[in-house]
């Protein structure tokens, strides 16, 4: 290809779609996979190790993750993951479960005790990252596409709420002292605080929008 043809091809690839793709609550629910119901697996690890000294290594190249003994640095278990995981998995407060987010929207919950992926759901088309509430009740996915936040039941990964952001969401994190999620907006001069300790009467989480400067 000539340089001009390369530029034209790049421009074509990067142009926005005429109709924004839809990935709403209906599509999210339809993608939900439960491999093991809550409470159906043993409450003790199937391997011997110091449970307070473990590592999860995310392998980007071949889409696997490895549970590593933090004392000996020997692999305990290596398992396949979704395509192109983000490198920052999140953990349940008790350390038993690890949550992964893939760049194409899949959220996976892995039971470290039983070395098994127990649930998965596709929360978006282009996902930036994932956070888990300090109390272990909620998980939340920050999406570029669609431009929203998706709140999940951390136990089952069932979708609870979709929050339209009107912006790409750069990142979301949990703020334990505030019992809140904090979300950064890409296209708005705002940071959102989403308290998770005081849901509304219908169970939904409310939003506090905080204006920011350049």
Positions of predicted regions on the chain:
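Predominantly soluble domains enriched in secretory-pathway, periplasmic, or organellar proteins
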Residues: 1-214
